[in-house]
């Protein structure tokens, strides 16, 4: 690794530690030439699968779109940002674990509902009503009845 101070190519690692729940390595380095010290972080480059929409079009996975949908569903509900971020992390891990290069948007929506039903039932109904395009009150009633079982 090049020294950020003198651009020398020879540096040595003084200390290595796992950070971010073991997903990154923090390394303390020292330049052999100028003896300045600096820190680097290493992490795996994780590629998310592409999303196949219902109309057949394909687009890159958009974490912000996923986060926005969840935030709208839990708006004014007693759900913390930590809970939201944990759910998003689990959804992304599940998608990566499929090993597929492409996943259907339907799978993402179902994963979102699986997590919302455990976080907050009202948020689940909100999301499901939009995602499943409820057209009348009876569809809301059916969804609520399933939750009460």
From Swiss-Prot:
Origin superkingdom: Bacteria
Pfam families in alphabetical order: ATP-cone, Zn_ribbon_NrdR
Keywords: ATP-binding, DNA-binding, Metal-binding, Nucleotide-binding, Repressor, Transcription, Transcription regulation, Zinc, Zinc-finger
UniProt entry tagged with the keyword Zinc: yes
Disulfide pattern: none
GO process annotations (BP): negative regulation of DNA-templated transcription
Entry-linked InterPro entries: ATP-cone_dom (IPR005144), NrdR-like_N (IPR055173), RNR_NrdR-like (IPR003796)
Zinc finger (unnamed): 3-34
Cofactor(s) it depends on: Zn(2+)
UniProt cofactor note: Binds 1 zinc ion.
Domain ATP-cone: 49-139
GO MF term list: ATP binding; DNA binding; zinc ion binding
Role played: Negatively regulates transcription of bacterial ribonucleotide reductase nrd genes and operons by binding to NrdR-boxes.
Annotated family: Belongs to the NrdR family.
Listed PANTHER family: TRANSCRIPTIONAL REPRESSOR NRDR (PTHR30455:SF2)
The protein's name in its UniProt record: Transcriptional repressor NrdR
Natural source organism: Shewanella halifaxensis (strain HAW-EB4)
Lineage of the species this protein comes from: Bacteria, Pseudomonadati, Pseudomonadota, Gammaproteobacteria, Alteromonadales
Protein encoded by which gene: nrdR
